[in-house]
């Protein structure tokens, strides 16, 4: 359980001279922010987060404390209206008053986008959209707003990701609506303009709801004045606590700026406790990250969500479930292995590949229903079968292994069926073998892979279309088979066909050594 009151990290104003470094804390303002980002339509984790939010609401502080509920975007996902209505209901359930516009809020077709956000319970914020004032979007999205709690005014600003158009499915449609994000340099200027506007109104506590990503958030923090907190998203970092040069930076004028982010897929949420001096400068802070799996699913939220999406069907039973991953981009994932096996079996391919970025869900011991299945890989990427050379497969595995040392661990390692490999913690592949359908292991020379050896491969349409740097897999238009179903369908069919409860365990097909 999270204790949202302990203020155990203290820092003062780092000004240009001794006088400006002095902090007056005679009349501090205390603030506690419950924040969420990048839930990606995950209804089950939303249900758990509702329980956590309710606990936050019930908590009584020893001293007067303002409470805020804020989001940093990508609470929605995809074009499924039901999924996105659940996301909006979630924001209403937990009482979020403002949210940044993320790229996944824009996944829908433009007509659906505008229809659905009409009912958005929170204020949509994005100051860095370059579009005419008469654009339809400007009627729904504000650059900033002011929220007043117990007589204290908080200025809230939002940013949309600069790579928006490349990250949404209907980019051309949204371009037709004159939706164009600013680049980072322009974004910094637009953010500063909003800060200055709020400051001129007497607001001295400024929170940026950013869906720009961690790297850009750091640039914004260092190159602006007046921002106190950046509640971040988009890059899926998990920033626990407060550490200098990690998520504590200083503005151009030397004031502290705290950056937060709570990972992805609703696995976590955050509570940021703050104390401001009379000038609106942070003097104390604590940043706690909570895990949604530590909280039960809220019964009322579950009922409402099922009314929106339909009641799920129980399809099987999990006898052994794998433990939660600490890093779901770089760790062996037994559920991904199960999914890859399902793809290989259903397509009859020699091997199957699943990029770690596509694995978003988890299973627990006990009965499993279709609502759990649909959250395992929510992107609905269709499966194809493609002939790849041994060299192309080796190059893909080697490329994915480098994720363990790359920034943000992207694109993530490649999960496999019909293969097994060993890699080091430095991201070097040291061995690779093909496992034929009779279980025979055939070593592959990773230093001299064959170009005349072909493997039929089950893979999705995303990773076979030159995304995430996998240029060696860019053969979508050479597919020998195209299927109308996705990874979730394959997993569901495998579970339904099981005659006994299922054990999902690590079989050692990917080993990471020192």
Features from the language model and the residues they span:
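Non-Sec secretion/translocation targeting segments of pathogen effectors
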Residues: 1-23
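Compositionally biased, low-structure terminal segments
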Residues: 12, 60-62, 296, 306
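Catalytic centers of hydrolytic enzymes
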Residues: 27-30, 36-42, 179, 262-514
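Acidic, metal/ion-coordinating pockets
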Residues: 23-292, 330-336, 342, 352, ...
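Compositionally biased regions
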Residues: 11, 21, 54, 145, ...
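Compositionally biased, intrinsically disordered low-complexity segments
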Residues: 8, 12-14, 26, 49, ...
């Amino acid at each position: 359980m999270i204790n949202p009151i302990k203020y155990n990290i203290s820092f003062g104003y780092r000004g240009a001279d001794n006088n400006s470094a002095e902090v007056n804390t005679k009349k501090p303002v205390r603030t506690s922010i419950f924040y969420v980002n990048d839930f990606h339509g995950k209804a089950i984790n939303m249900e758990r987060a509702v329980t956590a939010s309710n606990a936050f609401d019930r908590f009584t502080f020893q001293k007067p404390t303002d409470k805020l509920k804020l989001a940093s975007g990508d609470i929605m996902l995809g074009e499924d209206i039901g999924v996105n209505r659940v996301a909006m209901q979630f924001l209403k359930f937990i009482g979020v008053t403002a949210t940044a516009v993320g790229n996944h809020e824009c996944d829908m077709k433009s007509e659906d986008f505008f229809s659905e956000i009409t009912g958005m319970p929170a204020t949509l914020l994005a100051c860095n959209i370059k579009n005419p004032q008469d654009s339809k979007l400007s009627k729904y999205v504000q650059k900033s707003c002011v929220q007043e709690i117990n007589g204290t005014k908080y200025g809230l600003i939002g940013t949309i990701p600069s790579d928006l158009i490349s990250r949404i499915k209907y980019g051309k449609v949204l371009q037709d609506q004159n939706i164009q994000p600013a680049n980072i340099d322009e974004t910094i200027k637009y953010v500063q303009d909003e800060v200055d506007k709020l400051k001129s109104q007497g607001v001295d506590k400024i929170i940026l709801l950013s869906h720009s990503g961690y790297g850009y958030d750091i640039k914004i923090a260092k190159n602006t004045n007046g921002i106190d907190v950046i509640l971040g998203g988009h890059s899926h970092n998990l920033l626990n606590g407060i550490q200098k040069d990690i998520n504590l930076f200083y503005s151009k004028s030397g004031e502290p700026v705290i950056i937060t982010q709570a990972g992805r897929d609703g696995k976590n949420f955050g509570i940021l406790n703050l104390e401001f001096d009379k000038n609106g400068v942070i003097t104390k802070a604590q940043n706690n990250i909570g895990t949604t799996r530590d909280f039960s699913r809220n019964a009322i939220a579950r009922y409402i969500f099922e009314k929106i999406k339909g009641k799920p069907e129980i399809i099987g039973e999990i006898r052994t479930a794998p433990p939660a991953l600490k890093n779901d981009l770089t760790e062996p994932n037994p559920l991904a292995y199960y999914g890859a096996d399902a793809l290989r079996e259903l397509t009859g391919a020699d091997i199957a590949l699943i990029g770690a970025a596509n694995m978003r869900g988890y299973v627990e011991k006990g009965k499993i229903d279709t609502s759990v299945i649909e959250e395992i890989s929510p992107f609905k990427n269709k499966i194809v079968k493609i002939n790849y050379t041994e060299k192309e497969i080796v190059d893909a595995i080697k490329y994915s292994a480098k994720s363990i040392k790359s920034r943000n661990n992207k694109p993530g390692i490649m999960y496999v069926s019909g293969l097994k490999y060993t890699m080091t913690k430095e991201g070097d592949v040291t061995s690779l073998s093909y496992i034929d359908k009779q279980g025979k292991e055939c070593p592959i020379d990773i230093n001299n892979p064959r170009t005349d050896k072909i493997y039929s491969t089950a893979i999705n349409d995303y990773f076979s279309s030159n995304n995430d740097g996998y240029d060696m897999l860019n053969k979508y238009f050479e597919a020998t088979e195209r299927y109308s179903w996705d990874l979730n369908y394959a997993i569901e069919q495998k579970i339904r066909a099981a005659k006994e409860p299922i054990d999902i365990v690590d079989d050692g097909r990917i080993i990471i050594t020192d």
